[in-house]
A protein has these predicted regions:
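Non-heme di-metal
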Residues: 1-63
């Protein structure tokens, strides 16, 4: 990566993927009856969405 913009683009994609996968793990843990671990993965998904929003704001994304 050679520019901040390129770094932010990669960061946005990475955080999107992380939020999706953490959500899937939370669902899997929920279906196994492991509510505590499910809650942790949901929290991690929320953090990923927060990081994604921050990267998008820094990159100048607009809704």
């Amino acid at each position: 990566m050679e520019t901040v913009e390129e770094f932010l683009a990669h960061s946005i994609k990475l955080e999107q993927e992380a939020a999706l996968r953490f959500g899937q793990l939370a669902d899997a843990m929920d279906s196994c009856g492991n509510k505590e671990v499910s809650k942790l993965f949901r929290q991690l998904a929320d953090y990923s969405r927060m990081h994604q929003a921050d990267a998008q704001a820094r990159a100048g994304f607009r809704d």
